[in-house]
Amino acid sequence: MKFNEISEKLSPLVTNSSLTTHPDLNPDITAVAAVDEAVTGQLSYIEGGKFAAMVQKTAASALILPRDEALQAQATEKDIAWITTPEPRLLFAHAIKLFYQPFHPSPGIHPTAVIDSSVKLGKDIYIGPHVVIEQGVTIGDNACIHANVVIYPGVSIGDRTILHANCTIHERSQIGDNCVIHSGAAIGSEGFGFVPTPDGWFKMEQSGYVVLEDGVEIGCNSAVDRPAVGTTRVGRNTKIDNLVQVAHNCQISENCVFASQVGLAGGVKVGKRVILAGQVGVANQANIGDGVIASAQTGIPHDIAPGEIVSSSPAVPNKLYLKASAIYKRLPEMYQTLKRLQKKLEES
């Protein structure tokens, strides 16, 4: 595909993007690649900042650049075709779709699938080998159920939702349209509910529900647990990485992003557009406000106000954490200074 053809397809997708002003640079593009790995015939992108120097190092034939005249001049000097946009990474995400389409098998039901006679199947769905679908399940149009998926009784799955191989959807689960559940994930598994008694722990049955709203994505080997009563809910367009635990009764709002190994204890409430980086832990019943960002390995034992950026364990404002970290590095030097001052006081 010629670069100008790619530019024409991409330019309407991001506001205020502009085509290259060098019509003579119209290389053939056969693939996309990371900027430090790209070779002749490949398209990549640069967001600026610390990556700006990669313009001089890359072997890419074309780049998606920010609105930075210096970067554009460097690319032109190296005979690299370019298109500019305020959001290079977003435009590159669109570009990937021109060269790669995820595997989506043709509609049909594999003969080894076990499907109860009461199941309601939508149009043009795919059900792979050794899938098990129990009684009372409803599956929407154009859904894709890959090999070895198990769907428990009464589950509802929306249109165009994809269940990847070996995931499990337990009873009392409702999954919306355009969701993606990756391999090994468990949706609607029993919440961790036990009541102490003189004879040990009495199991509290988990009779509640799990709801994944439209556009939710759940990563490999993650779990969203159902509660004893009530509902565990994951809001619209929220994206959850691999190895994440969402406990019973959690309420997660729309457009959140959780990275790997995040753990939410029971009853946590998460506002809109919250970002939790890797290994963030949130304590029982904590409320996290809209727009909060928690850096990696933050421990959140209490409520966090909307818009806060927090770090460390227990969580503190990120600016305070950075100041404290800078001081921490100087503690040995400060300790020696303190010892000298103390000695002078004792001698005076």
UniProtKB/Swiss-Prot annotation:
Q: Which PROSITE patterns match?
A: HEXAPEP_TRANSFERASES (PS00101)
- Catalysed reaction, written as an equation: a UDP-3-O-[(3R)-3-hydroxyacyl]-alpha-D-glucosamine + a (3R)-hydroxyacyl-[ACP] = a UDP-2-N,3-O-bis[(3R)-3-hydroxyacyl]-alpha-D-glucosamine + holo-[ACP] + H(+)
Q: Name one GO molecular function term.
A: N-acyltransferase activity
| GO biological process assignments | lipid A biosynthetic process
Give the first-level EC class, as a single word.
transferase
Query: Which UniProt keywords are listed?
Result: Acyltransferase, Lipid A biosynthesis, Lipid biosynthesis, Lipid metabolism, Repeat, Transferase
Give the EC number(s) under which this enzyme is classified.
2.3.1.191
Q: Which SUPFAM superfamilies match?
A: Trimeric LpxA-like enzymes
InterPro entries per record: Hexapep (IPR001451), LpxD (IPR007691), Trimer_LpxA-like_sf (IPR011004), UDP_GlcNAc_AcTrfase_non-rep (IPR020573)
GO cellular component assignments: carboxysome; membrane
The pathway noted for it is: Bacterial outer membrane biogenesis; LPS lipid A biosynthesis
Give the residues annotated as active site: H248
Quote the subunit structure annotation: Homotrimer.
Cite the PANTHER family for this sequence: UDP-3-O-ACYLGLUCOSAMINE N-ACYLTRANSFERASE (PTHR43378), UDP-3-O-ACYLGLUCOSAMINE N-ACYLTRANSFERASE 1, MITOCHONDRIAL-RELATED (PTHR43378:SF2)
Q: Which purpose does this protein serve, as stated in its record?
A: Catalyzes the N-acylation of UDP-3-O-acylglucosamine using 3-hydroxyacyl-ACP as the acyl donor. Is involved in the biosynthesis of lipid A, a phosphorylated glycolipid that anchors the lipopolysaccharide to the outer membrane of the cell.
Q: What is this protein called?
A: UDP-3-O-acylglucosamine N-acyltransferase
Q: Which organism is it from?
A: Rippkaea orientalis (strain PCC 8801 / RF-1)
